[in-house]
């Protein structure tokens, strides 16, 4: 655990704005969240989707910042993160940037919420984007499930309503609609109806200064009087069924009249419901043949009400009756255990998870906790509060059949099942990865390659390990061979990622540095058996969004186009980054794999040609990933391409999403894929064909010369040089770049790249643009459309 929890402070500004501040010196980025106490349920019934539509419009210009100088272009230009989310009763806006840019981002965020332009032409363009999202939403299996479960709620309750917007529910030319839109913004986007959360490495005094200066922008005035929602009564167990694929089961409990402290208690409930250990609910459901995987969600939470949903990937014997019988048997056993026993280990797990959250997830989680429990503590404590202890039995008392609604789809009409196997209830065992590692002397030799380029810190170290074959590569085993270790690693603040089926054999550990060596040691033990006896590849669960499906398989498709020749293997390569000395000493005590250590791969073969890979999908929409490899791996080339990609982000997004409304999922980034680095562009569209999407992308690239060269290079150069320095805010990206270069050349020196970045000029940038847009420039397309003429497959 950290020697001291982060410093935090809460205050109220004169205009009524609630503020929460959190300072952690090891946070590489600073982040901000503004939560508004209004969402889709507060929108006028005559205009479903108005709240979500307004969320989109905020990004299209404000009183002091035109759209071209708003929050989104700033974040894109500075390599940060940004998003917004309209929920049932809240709307969130959040971003992360380097600490020195937090003030600039916060000024733009609060200005756009307080004084949006809401220009008519921008409204028309953005409504089409919203309509595209609506089409995708209306066709999804998740929507069918949500609408079916809503039928079990009281008709007068807003959670039972239809709140998605489209071009027909948003009549832009109607004066009444425009009046409602402006009134919604004025009525709800007030300081007293908002929460501002800031987190970063800056001193609390600096965070408070920013909050007071920029928070004063929001208008004062009383918060809108919240209308109490109708009760969520116990109406008896009921099920909706559908024959449509995919196979799914969902259970939803309607919780009502919950006391203060319930949401803190719910954190413990979530951990117990999802605990992947013998005797836990997921293990019990699998043993009974009822569920392969379990996911928990809160579709609705407000004050003393909530909808708790368990989403289930059905097991081989799954039925509604079998699932509910196994669930309620497990819950009955849970109720018999004293709360003090259930709490054991929970605080340690929760505190470790919070201690390793990046800045952006941290402000989001803190904002959620403080919004639901206004009087609660900001940081997890060693035990539940008195209010949470009192709320615990009342929370469990509502997890009963009388409050359950279920949805079943894609299951056989008749299924013969054996009696469910009783699984004894069990509590989570102690997690060995949460234990304080023993002190070790500094080793005389270090068998693992360690880079000192990234500044060491406890909060985030990284370790990469890869096995490689010079000839055909056997399929990587499914992550299931690792047993409980991915879950235990997550509890200890370590994100464990293993190769997806069909991809190269690579292990990545990222997170709490003192726990990395022990996690590596236990994972290696599990993987060694798979190396000795490779297994048939498993089928990965599908991603819910088409573009994410393509991104998931991209890492295995690109290397297949340029395989390295030879035979032999496996051999291993590894690299640790950002570890303090104590973690380095612990790492030295971990025995490396018994296989030989691999030599550097050398420079990759030159990539050429236009390659199209068809990824079959049942989705009616079309999605395209376009990868444009840079011509070589020289530092000067890489530096120019990285700057070029950064300059292209804003014009690509503006042209494809805003002006042409080509799709609602549009992104571009510099990516390292296999042996190649370059520009990756992704678009998903509900109406355009893959070839039309590609043509629009190429046209935008061809027209981008002026936009690429429009800005002075000074700020961009400095930002990129900082990104590849020891104190970078992009720790994972720098570590990945070190790992990429180390595999190729064995070198751990980024000085040549930093020097090339510092020396960039317009001539180098123009040369990179010419390489990208040349008629014979190599291309790789991954799409759910057939290979067109003229492309290699």
Regions found by a protein language model. Give the residues of each.
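Non-catalytic accessory/assembly modules
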Residues: 121, 125, 174, 198, ...
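N- or domain-start disorder-to-order transition segments that initiate the globular core
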Residues: 1-28, 426-460
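A structural supersecondary motif
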Residues: 248-252, 274-314, 486-499, 625, ...
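C-terminal regions of mature proteins
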Residues: 345-456, 560-590, 717, 722-793
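Acidic/histidine-enriched segments that form metal/cofactor-coordinating
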Residues: 36, 63, 67-184, 292-296, ...
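Active/ligand-binding-proximal structured segments within catalytic/core domains
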Residues: 16, 23-74, 133, 251, ...
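An aromatic/glycine/proline-enriched structural segment found at the starts
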Residues: 2, 160, 190-191, 195-250, ...
């Amino acid at each position: 655990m950290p020697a001291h929890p982060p410093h935090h402070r809460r205050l109220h500004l004169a205009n009524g704005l609630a503020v929460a501040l959190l300072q952690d010196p090891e946070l590489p980025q600073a982040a901000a969240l503004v939560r508004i106490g209004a969402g889709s349920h507060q929108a006028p019934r005559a205009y479903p989707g108005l709240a979500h539509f307004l969320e989109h419009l905020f990004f299209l210009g404000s009183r002091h910042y035109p759209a071209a100088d708003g929050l989104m272009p700033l974040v894109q230009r500075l390599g940060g993160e940004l998003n917004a989310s309209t929920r049932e009763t809240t709307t969130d806006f959040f971003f992360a940037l380097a600490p020195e840019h937090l003030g600039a981002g916060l000024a733009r965020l609060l200005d756009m919420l307080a004084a949006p332009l809401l220009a008519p032409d921008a409204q028309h363009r953005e409504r089409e984007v919203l309509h595209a999202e609506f089409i995708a939403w209306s066709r999804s299996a998740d929507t069918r499930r949500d609408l079916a479960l809503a039928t079990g709620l009281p008709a007068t309750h807003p959670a039972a309503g239809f709140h998605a917007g489209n071009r027909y529910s948003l009549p832009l030319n109607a004066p009444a609609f425009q009046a409602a839109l402006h009134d919604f913004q004025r009525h709800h986007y007030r300081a007293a109806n908002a929460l501002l959360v800031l987190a970063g490495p800056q001193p609390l005094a600096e965070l408070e200064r920013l909050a007071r200066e920029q928070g004063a922008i929001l208008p004062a005035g009383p918060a809108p009087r919240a209308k109490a929602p109708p009760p969520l009564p116990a109406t008896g167990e009921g099920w909706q069924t559908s024959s449509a694929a995919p196979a799914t089961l969902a259970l939803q409990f309607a919780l009502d009249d919950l006391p203060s402290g319930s949401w803190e208690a719910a954190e413990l409930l979530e951990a117990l419901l999802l605990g992947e250990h013998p005797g836990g609910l997921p293990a019990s459901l699998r043993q009974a043949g009822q569920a392969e995987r379990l996911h928990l969600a809160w579709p609705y939470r407000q004050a003393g009400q909530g909808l708790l949903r368990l989403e289930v990937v059905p097991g081989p014997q799954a039925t509604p009756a079998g699932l509910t019988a196994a669930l309620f048997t497990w819950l009955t056993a849970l109720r018999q255990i004293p709360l003090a026993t259930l709490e054991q280990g929970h605080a340690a797990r929760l505190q470790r998870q919070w201690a390793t959250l990046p800045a952006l997830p941290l402000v989001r989680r803190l904002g959620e906790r403080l919004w639901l429990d206004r009087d609660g503590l900001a940081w997890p404590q060693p035990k539940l509060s008195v209010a949470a202890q009192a709320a615990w039995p009342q929370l469990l008392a509502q997890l009963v059949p009388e409050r359950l609604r279920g949805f079943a789809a894609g299951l056989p009409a008749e299924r013969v099942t054996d009696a469910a196997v009783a699984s004894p209830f069990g509590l989570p065992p102690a997690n060995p990865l949460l234990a304080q590692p023993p002190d070790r002397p500094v080793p005389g030799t270090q068998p693992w390659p360690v880079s000192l380029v990234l500044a060491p810190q406890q909060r985030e170290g990284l370790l990469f390990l890869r096995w490689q074959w010079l000839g055909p590569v056997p399929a990587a085993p499914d992550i299931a061979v690792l047993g409980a270790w991915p879950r235990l690693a997550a509890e200890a603040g370590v994100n464990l990622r293993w190769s997806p089926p069909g991809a190269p054999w690579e292990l990545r550990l990222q997170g709490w540095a003192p726990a990395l060596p022990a996690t590596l040691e236990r994972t290696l033990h599990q993987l060694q058996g798979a190396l000795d006896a490779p297994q048939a590849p498993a089928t990965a669960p599908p991603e819910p969004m088409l573009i994410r499906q393509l991104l998931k398989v991209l890492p295995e498709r690109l290397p297949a186009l340029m395989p390295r020749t030879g035979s032999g293997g496996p051999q291993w390569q590894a690299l640790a980054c950002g570890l303090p000395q104590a973690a380095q000493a612990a790492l030295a005590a971990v025995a490396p794999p018994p296989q030989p250590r691999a030599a550097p791969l050398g420079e990759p073969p030159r990539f050429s040609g236009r390659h199209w890979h068809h990824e079959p999908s049942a989705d009616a929409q079309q999605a395209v990933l376009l990868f444009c490899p840079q011509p070589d791996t020289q530092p000067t080339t890489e530096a120019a391409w990285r700057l070029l990609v950064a300059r292209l982000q804003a014009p690509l997004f503006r042209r494809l999403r805003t002006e042409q409304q080509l799709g609602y999922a549009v992104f571009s980034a510099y990516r390292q894929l296999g042996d190649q680095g370059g520009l990756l562009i992704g678009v998903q569209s509900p109406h355009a064909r893959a070839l039309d999407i590609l043509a629009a992308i190429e046209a935008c690239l061809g027209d981008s010369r002026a936009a690429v060269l429009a800005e002075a290079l000074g700020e961009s150069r400095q930002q990129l040089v900082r990104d590849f320095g020891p104190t970078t805010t992009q720790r994972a990206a720098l570590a990945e770049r070190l790992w990429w270069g180390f595999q190729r050349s064995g070198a751990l020196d980024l000085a040549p790249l930093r020097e090339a970045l510092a020396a960039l000029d317009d001539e180098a940038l123009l040369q990179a643009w010419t390489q990208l847009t040349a008629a014979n420039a190599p291309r790789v397309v991954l799409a759910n459309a057939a290979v067109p003429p003229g492309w290699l497959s």
